[in-house]
């Protein structure tokens, strides 16, 4: 055996590491070339994931465990996490996704000693076996066709050959980027986002009635009935909330693609709720 001093949550411990003749034995608890228990490394990773700086983590580890780490030693450990993230973000993907959902989650983050707003684009895909998969996360500051095209091109480079339906908020420049990357894909604007945008400047006393008229549109049995419901919505509200009517009319094609599908799958297509559920889970840990 070979003696080795290992840092653990109980302090420094002397461990006798078994050896074999070929030198192939690699302990699981304390891997080769490591002088820290996996438990402590996981603690450091968790603190780093919560946004603590390497200096703050170093202070925390000393105060709680009585073990002194330099900031550079902490960085060596956290860099492993960055490598894992990079591998995940660049992993190969399926060749076909019947549906992908795109939505953003926004954070206030510390950058250069000041707090700035950042957005993270989340892309989730529905696989052929019915399971959902997070395809990737991308940080951005401004919405543009160039950024969306870069994301979609990255998906193609990772193996995605075709997408049937893309469901998203009405993000600026996204429709054009989808047509460039996946010409045959159908773009479906999230109905929930569209309703929220329609209600932005609606007075409280009008909300219930206006929502009922909107419901007649997206719960229509088909496109023709939905068009008739839109005409009714326009006759009722155009004079008071013309911006809402105009938004539905100008985006009509990309708002109603879901009506071409059976009722059983429409709700899967016309909302990005699957991403909002994922985003709410992210907020619990960030």
Regions found by a protein language model. Name each.
Residues 35-40, 209:
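Alpha-helix N-cap/N′ positions at the starts of helices
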Residues 55-66:
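DNA-recognition alpha helix
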Residues 39-51:
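Short, amphipathic alpha-helical "recognition" segments used to contact nucleic acids or chromatin
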């Amino acid at each position: 055996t070979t003696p080795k001093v290992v840092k653990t949550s109980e302090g420094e411990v002397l461990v006798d590491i078994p050896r074999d003749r070929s030198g192939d034995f690699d302990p699981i608890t304390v891997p080769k070339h490591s002088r820290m228990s996996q438990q402590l490394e996981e603690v450091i990773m968790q603190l780093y994931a919560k946004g603590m700086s390497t200096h703050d983590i170093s202070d925390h580890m000393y105060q709680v465990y009585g073990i002194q780490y330099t900031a550079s030693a902490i960085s060596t450990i956290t860099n492993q996490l960055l490598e894992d993230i990079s591998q995940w973000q660049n992993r190969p993907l399926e060749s076909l996704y019947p549906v992908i959902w795109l939505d953003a989650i926004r954070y206030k983050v510390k950058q250069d000693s000041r707090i700035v707003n950042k957005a993270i684009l989340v892309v989730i895909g529905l696989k052929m076996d019915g399971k959902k998969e997070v395809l990737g996360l991308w940080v951005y500051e401004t919405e543009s066709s160039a950024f969306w095209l870069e994301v979609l091109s990255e998906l193609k480079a990772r193996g995605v050959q075709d997408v049937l339906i893309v469901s998203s908020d009405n993000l600026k420049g996204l429709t054009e980027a989808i047509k460039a990357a996946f010409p045959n894909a159908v773009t479906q604007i999230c109905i929930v986002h569209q309703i929220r945008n329609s209600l932005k400047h609606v007075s409280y006393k009008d909300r219930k009635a206006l929502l009922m008229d909107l419901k007649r549109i997206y719960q229509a049995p088909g496109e023709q009935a939905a068009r008739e419901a839109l005409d009714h919505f326009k006759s009722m509200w155009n004079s008071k909330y013309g911006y809402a009517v105009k938004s539905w009319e100008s985006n009509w094609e990309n708002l109603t693609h879901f009506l071409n599908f059976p009722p059983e799958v429409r709700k899967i297509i016309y909302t990005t709720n699957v991403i909002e559920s994922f985003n709410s889970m992210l907020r619990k840990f960030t």
